[in-house]
């Protein structure tokens, strides 16, 4: 990874790693004999200043049905439902789509979803086949524990979203990003909330980005 970052002369970068089962004649079954897997690593500039400016304003999200397959915990390149949800968000002037299955928010099209209840509890969907866990999510949980912020990993409903004091999303490219609108409605006062701000600051320090 460091070789790719250095080769592209990048200081702050987003690195993407993709592994496939290798090169072989097209067939759904695995090649026999086995072939070496293919590894592709790419890196692109990460503009922390731009990300920080966006976090000061917050972002808008929309909700969309979660029509993905049943094992989204496996990070694959089959992301058509995610791409369609993301495009739907863009057309409505939003940055992200929160996916909903049976009345519960699972995660974003390209991020994890979080709410802050009026009592100050931070809630995110638990790990399992419904969401793609990641390093950012894991790190934010560690930050919350360090700050002694109560955190629960459980499903949460659209009703809870509507009643929440704060909403935010997390991802490698957004870090901790406050949400100020959902489906055209203001979240709280329509500005980034204090808990999302604290978690973002803690995340930046933990990752030595502050």
Regions found by a protein language model. Give the residues of each.
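Conserved alpha/beta cores of soluble small-molecule-handling proteins
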Residues: 1-97, 101-104, 141-210
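Glycine- and Gly-Pro-enriched alpha-helical subdomains that act as flexible
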Residues: 98-127, 131-133
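Feature captures the catalytic cores and cofactor-binding loops of soluble hydro-lyases/lyases
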Residues: 134-139
């Amino acid at each position: 990874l460091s070789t790719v970052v250095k080769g592209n002369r990048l200081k702050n970068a987003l690195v993407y790693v993709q592994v496939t089962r290798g090169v072989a004649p097209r067939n759904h079954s695995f090649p026999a004999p086995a072939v070496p897997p293919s590894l592709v690593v790419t890196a692109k500039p990460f503009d922390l200043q731009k990300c920080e400016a966006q976090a000061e304003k917050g972002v808008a999200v929309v909700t969309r049905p979660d029509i993905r397959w049943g094992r989204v915990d496996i990070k694959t390149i089959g992301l058509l439902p995610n791409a369609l949800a993301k495009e739907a968000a863009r057309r409505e002037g939003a940055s992200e789509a929160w996916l909903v299955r049976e009345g519960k928010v699972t995660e974003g099209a390209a991020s994890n979803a979080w709410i802050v209840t009026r009592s100050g509890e931070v809630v995110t969907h638990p790990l399992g086949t419904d969401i793609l866990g990641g390093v950012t999510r894991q790190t934010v949980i560690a930050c919350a524990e360090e700050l002694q912020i109560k955190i629960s990993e459980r499903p949460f409903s659209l009703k809870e979203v509507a009643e929440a004091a704060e909403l935010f999303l997390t991802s490698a490219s957004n870090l901790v990003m406050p949400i100020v609108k959902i489906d055209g409605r203001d979240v709280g006062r329509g500005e980034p909330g204090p808990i999302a701000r604290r978690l973002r600051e803690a995340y930046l320090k933990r990752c030595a980005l502050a």
